[in-house]
């Protein structure tokens, strides 16, 4: 044992112990040499749960999914060099979707920086503005002052990651050789000088009385709508419904709002706006005086188009942090306060009998018409087209299941075909940067928290992250993946690019012709190809009770998919005309 080893051990033990005391329970480690002391010290901690992922990009998204589902900070550890750069996509997503990650990167000591040393690159501010905070840690020392410094940075990292708006934090650790700390006796049970832990307390932003009264006055007796985008706060679901009923306002609820699947059905929850707002002819009948938006912007483009054309209205955006989430430049009042506080205080201060029943009835009539058409069409459809897959999942998913939703077509089909249901289904997706990469790993991370967990994903997105399946094999994780295989980029068939057939397939269709049954075998998963509704039901039922990885593949046709969607929209348009 050398003094260097003791210094290294004491310094890192102080830091890691403080992370745990501040609320960290899991660490995702990407193997490497320079990160050896941090990896060993985290593995030695009696409370910290360790996952080892050899693919850094997968590791980043696994941590993202776990932090998203658990709502607590998760640690990521990588060695020096390009390994750390592979975390970038997950960090960008975490920043935009406000997920608390603590990224630890090992680095060469200062004397080996910028001198051509192997596996060394500039890691200072590596993630730029995509992290909330960056610290280049001091070289290890074990004086009282430096041990306080180490533990202080552990507390501070968790505090910054968890403070509203939540997000990723990066700490870079320069480490000298030798890199092996002392594990006997355990650095977490050895006697010696102890340092107190920092207790962190959080508060909620609230509004002053005059602002509350102004908002109540603006909303009393007015035609208004709530727009609720992706927001993962179960505590606001019932208060939102209660306030909407009192005001007589509809709630336009994105699939990721939680309001379509929180265990109850309510007429005020509008789930088919994406379908009926495609018809601009009805917009004049639905012009509000007030809009109050919670969460990020919903996925629906027809909703976005409708909101953009509104004028001379009061448009509130509610955000508990300092973010400015107004991509359509419509906000008239930006409210930075806790959502539950606002709903409760408005409910308390809002006069009774102020609702305009005809206003809510108009919205529910359009919604019910569109919903009945969608449900009827899906009941009468015997083939496994893409909308039918979502409709069947809505029926087949067990109560309290988790559903991770891929980007591109899957999230949009869930918006259209997954209407309100009286089951509790936890829906998750990466809707910060909206990328199709890392979705498998994110779902696996979320599966640590929610069971049973299902993933609805397209073939290209699945291909992007097949490496992530190693975690399912290694840790015997329970995940059912439903691959909608339309052999390429299905969403492009709905976009203007489809009007240029000369290069469409080569540049946008991008057929891969991959056989995914081999991916299932490679990672010890069960494979099922569903060619009919009955086969899909059988596969989902088996997977629900099977512990391990299940891959259910449904092959569809991109061109038929577009035609099927258009036929449904045409029928909804016809049904809406009958209401006028």
Curated annotation (Swiss-Prot):
Reactions listed under catalytic activity: isochorismate + 2-oxoglutarate + H(+) = 5-enolpyruvoyl-6-hydroxy-2-succinyl-cyclohex-3-ene-1-carboxylate + CO2
Protein name listed in UniProt: 2-succinyl-5-enolpyruvyl-6-hydroxy-3-cyclohexene-1-carboxylate synthase
Pathway(s): Quinol/quinone metabolism; 1,4-dihydroxy-2-naphthoate biosynthesis; 1,4-dihydroxy-2-naphthoate from chorismate: step 2/7; Quinol/quinone metabolism; menaquinone biosynthesis
Family assignment from sequence similarity: Belongs to the TPP enzyme family. MenD subfamily.
Cofactors (names): Mg(2+); Mn(2+); thiamine diphosphate
GO MF annotations, alphabetized: 2-succinyl-5-enolpyruvyl-6-hydroxy-3-cyclohexene-1-carboxylic-acid synthase activity; magnesium ion binding; manganese ion binding; thiamine pyrophosphate binding
Function of the protein: Catalyzes the thiamine diphosphate-dependent decarboxylation of 2-oxoglutarate and the subsequent addition of the resulting succinic semialdehyde-thiamine pyrophosphate anion to isochorismate to yield 2-succinyl-5-enolpyruvyl-6-hydroxy-3-cyclohexene-1-carboxylate (SEPHCHC).
NCBIfam families: menD
Entries under InterPro entries matching the protein: DHS-like_NAD/FAD-binding_dom (IPR029035), MenaQ_synth_MenD (IPR004433), MenD_middle (IPR032264), THDP-binding (IPR029061), Thiamin_PyroP_enz_TPP-bd_dom (IPR012001), TPP_enzyme_TPP-bd (IPR011766)
């Amino acid at each position: 044992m050398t003094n260097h080893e003791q210094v290294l051990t004491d310094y890192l033990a102080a830091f890691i112990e403080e992370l745990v005391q501040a609320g960290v329970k899991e660490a995702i480690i990407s193997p490497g040499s320079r990160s050896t002391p941090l990896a060993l010290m985290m593995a030695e901690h009696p409370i910290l749960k360790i996952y080892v992922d050899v693919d850094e990009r997968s590791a980043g998204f696994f941590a993202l999914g776990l932090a998203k589902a658990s709502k607590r900070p998760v640690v990521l550890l990588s060695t020096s060099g390009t390994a750390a750069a592979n975390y970038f996509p997950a960090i960008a997503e975490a920043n935009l979707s406000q997920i608390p990650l603590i990224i630890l990167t090992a680095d060469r000591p200062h004397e080996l920086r910028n001198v051509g040393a192997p596996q060394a690159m500039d890691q200072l501010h590596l993630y730029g503005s995509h992290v909330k905070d960056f610290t280049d840690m001091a070289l290890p020392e074990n004086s009282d002052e430096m041990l306080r410094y180490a533990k202080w940075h552990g507390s501070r990292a968790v505090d910054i990651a968890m403070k509203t708006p939540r997000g990723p934090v990066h700490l870079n650790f320069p480490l000298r050789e030798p890199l092996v700390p002392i594990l006997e006796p355990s650095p977490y049970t050895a006697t010696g000088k102890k340092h107190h832990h920092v207790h962190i307390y959080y508060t909620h932003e609230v509004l002053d009385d005059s602002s509350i009264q102004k908002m109540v006055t603006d909303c009393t007796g007015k035609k208004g709508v709530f727009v609720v985008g992706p927001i993962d706060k179960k505590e606001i679901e019932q208060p939102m419904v209660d306030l909407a009923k009192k005001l007589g306002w509809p709630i336009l609820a994105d699939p990721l709002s939680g309001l379509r699947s929180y265990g109850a059905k309510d007429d005020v929850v509008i789930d088919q706006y994406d379908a009926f707002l495609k018809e601009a002819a009805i917009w004049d009948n639905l012009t509000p005086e007030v809009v109050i938006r919670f969460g990020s912007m919903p996925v629906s483009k027809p909703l976005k188009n409708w909101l953009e054309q509104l004028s001379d209205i009061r448009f509130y955006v509610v955000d508990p942090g300092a973010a400015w989430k107004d991509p359509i430049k419509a906000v008239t009042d930006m409210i930075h306060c806790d959502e539950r506080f606002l709903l409760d205080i408005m409910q308390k201060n809002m006069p009774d009998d102020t609702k305009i029943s005809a206003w809510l009835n108009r919205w529910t009539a359009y919604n019910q018409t569109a919903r009945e058409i969608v449900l009827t069409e899906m009941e009468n459809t015997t083939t496994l087209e893409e909308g039918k897959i979502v409709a069947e999942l809505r029926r087949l998913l067990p109560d309290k299941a988790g559903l991770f939703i891929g980007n591109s077509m899957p999230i949009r089909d869930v918006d259209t075909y997954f209407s309100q249901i009286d089951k509790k289904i936890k829906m998750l997706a990466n809707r910060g940067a909206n990328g199709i990469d890392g979705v498998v790993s994110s779902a696996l991370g979320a599966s640590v928290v929610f069971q049973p967990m299902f993933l609805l994903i397209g073939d290209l997105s699945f291909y992007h992250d097949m490496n992530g399946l190693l975690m399912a094999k290694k840790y015997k994780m329970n995940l059912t993946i439903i691959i909608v295989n339309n052999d390429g980029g299905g969403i492009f068939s709905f976009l203007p690019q489809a009007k240029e057939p000369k290069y469409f397939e080569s540049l946008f269709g991008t057929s891969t012709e991959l056989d995914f049954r081999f991916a299932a075998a490679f990672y010890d998963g069960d494979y099922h190809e569903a060619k009919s509704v009955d086969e899909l039901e059988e596969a989902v039922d088996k997977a629900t009770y099977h512990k391990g990885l299940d891959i259910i593949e449904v092959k569809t046709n991109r061109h038929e998919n577009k035609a099927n969607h258009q036929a449904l929209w045409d029928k909804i348009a016809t049904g809406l005309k009958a209401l006028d």
